[in-house]
Each structure stands twice: as structure tokens, then as C-alpha cells.
Amino acid sequence: MTHLRKSHPLIKIINHSFIDLPTPSNISAWWNFGSLLGICLMMQIITGLFLAMHYTADTTTAFSSVTHICRDVNYGWLIRYLHANGASMFFILIYLHIGRGVYYGSYTFSETWNIGVVLLLAVMATAFMGYVLPWGQMSFWGATVITNLLSAIPYIGPTLVEWIWGGFSVDKATLTRFFAFHFIFPFIIVALVMTHLLFLHETGSNNPSGLNSDSDKIPFHPYYTIKDIMGFMFMGFTALLLVLFSPDLLGDPDNYTPANPLNTPPHIKPEWYFLFAYAILRSIPNKLGGVMALLASILILALFPILHLSKQRSMTFRPISQCLLWVLAANLVILTWIGGQPVEHPYIMIGQLASITYFLTILILMPLASLMENKILKW
């Protein structure tokens, strides 16, 4: 008799995805981030659901309702800070996951990679809308500044902005719709994640060598389930460390002041995980140019499969490309730092140089390095 997990229509899908899945025997801890992101997404949906039970999406009571959650709801402070810091954890894991994909050439699975880019955009949109909900100063002004960027679109821009606002400024209508979208988006993300996995399981996982691993596969369970559990423990420990000891470390103090349309904060800036893109946006003096650069900074990921000119898939045996990838990583750290600084000398110049370096490295230097390595290896 066939085992139930191999015959039952529903359990069979889970079996082929997480139990009997043939997996390369040499994948490293860098392959843990996918499952960690899955757990993180589940945590965000659960904590978010409990927060939504007590939150009111109204400009007069939104700020008070968040305060009420922290003060009066049983373990409300824990749920709120798990949700806020969970977003930071999510982005740390996403950036590491993307970095792994770039280093090991996982972007050659173009369908999986492109769905991943769509996922990144969806997660960024969700995080932005979530940041508006507590209705603090930075929530309000962040929403005003970022939505206002759409007015740079020729002809339809101003109308589009007012349509998104639901009026002539960020107000009650904006908050209500942002709450509605923030609630529904994670479920769209879950659907996208399933598509992401569907396409990944069509080809099988990549591995550190970048070579075909069909001849050496092992079942996902128990080898990688136990390895993933170690990742969960590390992530859980880090999240609790953050939530219980310094929950406001990554937040903005301005968001503890209720939103006031008559008083602009001295430095309007988004959460830390958007700062690199914000720095690129600010480094271009023209509004439309800045918006285009902002979009390009994320959408450039979709070009990786085209820009891959090396005869090898992974960077494991390509030291020049490795150096450039670390230059790119350092450059992103610099952009993140600049995004949080005021718009004054010397930060403007550093931001502009870092923005140029970002695009130059990806579009020109890395493909050139690949060609050079091919030449050196006489391939």
C-alpha cells in the first residue's frame, strides 16, 4: 500500500515540495534564507492579524489605537514590536537572499528570478503602506513625500496623485485605503511565493558550484529540514533580542509624535531598508529623473539574466567578479548611510558618487569582468 503522503492529492503536493524533494547535496547555509523568509512572512501575517483586531484606520484615532495596543492589550507591545521589527528582519533576509542569488548565479532560472523581483516590489509596497498606519509624523510626511513622487509622471501625474490620496492631501481616505491594501497584500505575496516555488521546483535548486547536480541529490527531509530549523532558531533569537531589548533601535523617534500636517519634521526619511533607494532618488536634482533612478535601482535586478556574460554560472571560481560584488555590497551600505543623512555638503556629493558607482558596477564593470575572466580561462 502506498504511503498516504504519496497518494493523497493535497498531502502529495506538500510531500513533493518539502519532504521527498530531490535537493543538491552541497547547498550551504546561504540556501536557508528562502525558508526563513517563509517563516517570517507567516509571523508577519499572524501578528498583523492580531494588530488589525485592535487598530482603527481613522486619522483621529489611529495613533491612539496603536498606543492602546501597546498599553492595554495583553502582550500588545510584544505583538506590535514583533510586527515592526519583523519587517526589518524580512528585509535583511530578502537582501541576503538576493545577494546569494547574484553570487551563485541563481538568476539564470529567469522565471523564478523575475517572480522574485515582483515579490520584492510587492513586499516594498506593503512595508511602505504599513509604515503609514501608526499615523505618526514620519508616517504622514513619508506618505506625502513618496506618493507625491508620482506627480513627476508627465500629463497624468497630478491627477494620479490626487486619485491615490482620495482628496487634495494625505488624509482619512488615504489612511483607510492604505490599511485595506496593507491587509490584502500579504496574501497576494503568499500566492506569489507559491508561484516562485512552483517555478523553482521545475528546475531544482542551484548549488554553490553552479554545476548540474542531478547526479548527486538527497531528499529534503531530514537533511535540510533539520538545517532549516537551525536557521529558525538563529532568526528567532535575533528577533527576540531586538524586540525585548531595543525595540525602537530601527525606528524613527519622530513617529512617536502624532501626525501634524502643519509641522514638517526637519529630516523626512523612510525606514532603514529603503534608504539606499531614497539616496539614489535624492542624488538626482530633477524630480522625474530621480523617480526613474529610484525605479531603476530595483528593476535593474531583472536585467541580471541578460547581463550574465560569463561561461561559468557561479562566482565561486571567479575572483574578479567576487571583488566587484563586494564593492557593490559596500556601495549599498554607503547609500543606506547617505539616505539617512541631511541634504547638505559633503553628503550630496557622496550620494551622487555612490549612485553612479551602483549603476556602473552592475551595468558595465560586472559584465566586463565576466568577459575578462572568460578570456583569462581561454573559454
Curated annotation (Swiss-Prot):
Entry membrane topology: Multi-pass membrane protein
Note: Heme 1 (or BL or b562) is low-potential and absorbs at about 562 nm, and heme 2 (or BH or b566) is high-potential and absorbs at about 566 nm.
Designated name of the protein: Cytochrome b
Residues given in the record as heme b b562 binding sites: 83, 182
SUPFAM superfamilies in the cross-refs: a domain/subunit of cytochrome bc1 complex (Ubiquinol-cytochrome c reductase), Transmembrane di-heme cytochromes
Gene behind this protein: MT-CYB
Similarity comment text for this entry: Belongs to the cytochrome b family.
Function: Component of the ubiquinol-cytochrome c reductase complex (complex III or cytochrome b-c1 complex) that is part of the mitochondrial respiratory chain. The b-c1 complex mediates electron transfer from ubiquinol to cytochrome c. Contributes to the generation of a proton gradient across the mitochondrial membrane that is then used for ATP synthesis.
Entry-linked InterPro entries: Cyt_b/b6_C (IPR005798), Cyt_b/b6_C_sf (IPR036150), Cyt_b/b6_N (IPR005797), Cytb/b6-like_sf (IPR027387), Cytochrome_b (IPR030689), Cytochrome_b_C_euk/bac (IPR048260), Cytochrome_b_N_euk/bac (IPR048259), Di-haem_cyt_TM (IPR016174)
Lineage of origin: Eukaryota, Metazoa, Chordata, Craniata, Vertebrata
Native source organism of the sequence: Myoprocta acouchy (Red acouchi)
